Amino acid sequence: MKKQDISENQAKNIFLGIGSNLGNRIINIEKAKSLLLESGIDFISVSNYYETPSWPDPKKPKFINIVLKVNCKQKPQEMINLCKLIEAKLGRRKSPKNSPRICDIDIIDFDGLVLKDKLCLPHARMHERNFVLFPLFEIEKEWVHPIKKVNIKKLIFSLPNKDIR
């Protein structure tokens, strides 16, 4: 496990995923980005938009997703709390797992930190998700999974479903 004092230093190499499959998906994502900026999160890189079928039910509305590389002063739990607050401000409500949503913000990787308590870092299923890996690759071509120690190119190559636009 990577040990560091995130409270004293600004964390680097934090990756967030933002997705939406309800309403005006791009506007929802842009509002989420604005709220992150207003909260003091500094953007280093922002991927293009990627559209994917809803998973696990492709009959539900398609998602649009992006990945951001950011700097922040928050600790991991503070960051996820901020993400959940922004989701709520945009209208996300508690709903069954994998339901359509206005906004979903996930911490993909927090500076290589590995946590398995209340907050799981890196994101537990990110290495299986085309809508995370493709935009992440766009902005960080040399990224390596902190647990699996596999680079992003190999993770993308191993994806069973590469259906993404």
PLM features: residue spans?
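Nucleotide and nucleotide-moiety/phosphate-recognizing core
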Residues: K2-L16, L22-S95, D111-G112
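Short glycine- and Lys/Arg-enriched binding-loop motifs that mark or flank ligand-binding interfaces
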Residues: N13-F15, G19, F131, H145
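Flexible, gly/pro- and Lys/Arg-enriched active-site loops
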Residues: S45, S54-F63, Q74-N81, L85-R165
